[in-house]
């Protein structure tokens, strides 16, 4: 029999790094085509005008312009990009 207690080990002491999700460009901010506006899991926010939806549900700008968050209907939000108005 061992006269010293064996080395213990921890089993549940692991964690994964955060995924850096969320809004990257806020309402009223200027974006260039290709800029990521939101990284999300699922379509918490739906794509509106002049934005694309990536296969991981990332919303990105298709044109240069200003970001605008809008209400699509009672349960849904959408984000759009509107071009700069030339006066």
From Swiss-Prot:
SUPFAM superfamilies the record matches: Ribosomal L27 protein-like (SSF110324)
GO biological process: translation
Keyword Nuclease: no
InterPro entries from the UniProt entry: Ribosomal_bL27, Ribosomal_bL27_CS
Span list, region Disordered: 1-21
Gene3D superfamilies assigned: 2.40.50.100
One Pfam family per UniProt: Ribosomal_L27
GO molecular-function terms, A-Z: structural constituent of ribosome
Entry superkingdom: Bacteria
Keyword terms of this UniProt record: Ribonucleoprotein, Ribosomal protein
Keyword check for Ribonucleoprotein: yes
An annotated GO cellular component: cytosolic large ribosomal subunit
Family: Belongs to the bacterial ribosomal protein bL27 family.
Protein name in UniProt: Large ribosomal subunit protein bL27
Organism, as annotated: Nautilia profundicola (strain ATCC BAA-1463 / DSM 18972 / AmH)
